[in-house]
Amino acid sequence: MAKKIEAYIKLQVPAGNANPSPPVGPALGQHGVNIMEFCKAFNAQTQSMEKNLPVPVVITVFNDRSFTFITKTPPASVLLKKAAGIQKGSGVPNMDKVGTVTRAQLEEIANTKMADLNANDLDAAVKIIAGSARSMGLNVEG
């Protein structure tokens, strides 16, 4: 008989740096999942990524307390802030511009995010990322 799904848990965990402290511990603990087993598996899977880059993860918990997880690509906003060299986006994006990103940087981010974006080709993905950049108060060049 197939395992019955008990819950889906969505978290953002720093790449290669999952530990039992919040938010990971409480979220997994309330479903009875072995927290250290998840932390070891997650850290092993994300060791090739840049350290401490937040990685969205969807954990599927089954009724026998086993689990599987899927890692996604880092959020576009984090990648854009890193590319522009800023700490945070603008509070008033249409008035205050806090940085600039080039077309090449947008293409690089779109390539990274392509698996998680709802786009058919790279050009459409670049437009999605450019829209995110504008809504953060970044100027888009090119």
UniProtKB/Swiss-Prot annotation:
CDD domains: Ribosomal_L11 (cd00349). GO terms for cellular component: cytosolic large ribosomal subunit. It comes from the Bacteria. One of its GO terms (biological process) is translation. GO terms for molecular function: large ribosomal subunit rRNA binding; structural constituent of ribosome. One or more lysine residues are methylated. Keywords: Methylation, Ribonucleoprotein, Ribosomal protein, RNA-binding, rRNA-binding. It holds the Pfam family Ribosomal_L11_N. Disulfide bonds: none annotated. Part of the ribosomal stalk of the 50S ribosomal subunit. Interacts with L10 and the large rRNA to form the base of the stalk. L10 forms an elongated spine to which L12 dimers bind in a sequential fashion forming a multimeric L10(L12)X complex. Forms part of the ribosomal stalk which helps the ribosome interact with GTP-bound translation factors. Belongs to the universal ribosomal protein uL11 family. This is Large ribosomal subunit protein uL11. It comes from Hydrogenovibrio crunogenus (strain DSM 25203 / XCL-2) (Thiomicrospira crunogena).
